[in-house]
């Protein structure tokens, strides 16, 4: 996990250094971007729907402290796919660097992509069932819309609902932390409490960065 994150950060540094010294506007990768965004929309929507189906079958509710099955772990397989999808998400940074879209290569972007991968490695090893289902549903839904936006942006720059996408992302973080606060406040021990506390702090940082981006952009 650490090796992959280190490789990602190395690419960001070295790739930026090299591309800024090359003449021209960078590579376009229209065909690859076209296919990539379609694949992401399909993958994210699948993970969202699959998690919802599992939640319904297992009788999970929106009230936190759902059953955590250590052995069967019905959510584990889709969480593994969710975790691996974060490797695919590194392509977002690849496109930004190779296209020289420097305005998009922000601290928020790099922080999000590097830390989310590490954080869900922890989930995959400790919080692989139960209440993690809600995160996959919310994140899968938001990313389905986000990659739809990226797909549309390949063809037009006039996308009126861009700011609403950012608002939805912040609502997602709010919902995640409501869940975390409930888990911590209720004394629920089915989902690892230490992981929940780390989750809460991390999501607060993400909400703050997205809120700052929203204020600066809109």
Task: Show where each model-derived region lies.
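Structured ligand/cofactor/substrate-binding pocket environments in proteins
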Residues: 141
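Acidic, glycine-rich loop-and-strand cores that form catalytic or ligand-binding grooves
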Residues: 144
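Membrane-helix and juxtamembrane interface regions of eukaryotic multi-pass membrane proteins
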Residues: 1-138, 150-166, 171, 175-218
